[in-house]
Amino acid sequence: MSSPLRTMISRLSLFRPAHTRYAAAAHFHATSNCSGARVAVVLSGCGVFDGTEIHEASAILVHLSRGGAEVQMFAPDVSQMHVIDHGKGQPSETESRNVLSESARIARGNITDLAKLSASNHDAIIFPGGFGAAKNLSTFAIDGMDCEVNKEVERVLKDFHKAGKPIGLCCISPVLAAKVLPGVDVTVGHEEEQGGKWPYAGTTQTITALGAKHTVKDVTEAHVDQKNKVVTTPAFMCDTKLHLIFDGIGAMVRDVLKLSGK
């Protein structure tokens, strides 16, 4: 092995034990010596078509860091519904992947099984979007309003809600709250496609069919259900520029932190 390559690998710390390697990785999503809100972020894999929407997750982490939050990331230890070749946009017939392992890519290795998440240890919880929310955290992508929500996802949503702690959701993930929390008021954006700007506008009909309320919001806005302490924003439910989605997620994060009282 050449000296430059050996040096690069050493700097990347690939040969260090995992427990020491991941300690440094934690700084990607946690503020050192932080006295702010303790926020759990729940991932659903890695990649928009079969897991977490990576831009949304990154935006959430940036805004949480800016807000002084201490972040811990979680994902369920389950198999993905399927694996999508993101270059071809097609399912891979020969691959299977684990949601927890794939989510670790975004978390830089510092990830915890969702089964270990306790609402008593956190002040708020946030769910990024991506099709993983509809495929791995629930069966919404297949079953619509008749979907089932992963038992651990359902548990933590109910636990945070019962404890009066804020819940943030973006993109398609508000359907999880609509299914689990009766009468919750959420947004996934607009209720008409508007020439393709809102390609998933039909989701609003399913939300209302579940007994939840839908409030129209633009992509840069967040909607706050004060009664249930649920904060939502459309994110990539809108076909628009990335910085606008980033701004909307920022609004959601700020409202979540405000509701946490930290």
From Swiss-Prot:
Its main location: mitochondrion. InterPro entries: Class_I_gatase-like (IPR029062). The gene is gatd3. Residues 1-8 form a transit peptide. Belongs to the GATD3 family. One of its GO terms (cellular component) is mitochondrion. It comes from Danio rerio. This is Glutamine amidotransferase-like class 1 domain-containing protein 3, mitochondrial. Keywords: Mitochondrion, Transit peptide. It is found in: Mitochondrion. The keyword Repeat does not apply. It comes from the Eukaryota. SUPFAM superfamilies: Class I glutamine amidotransferase-like.
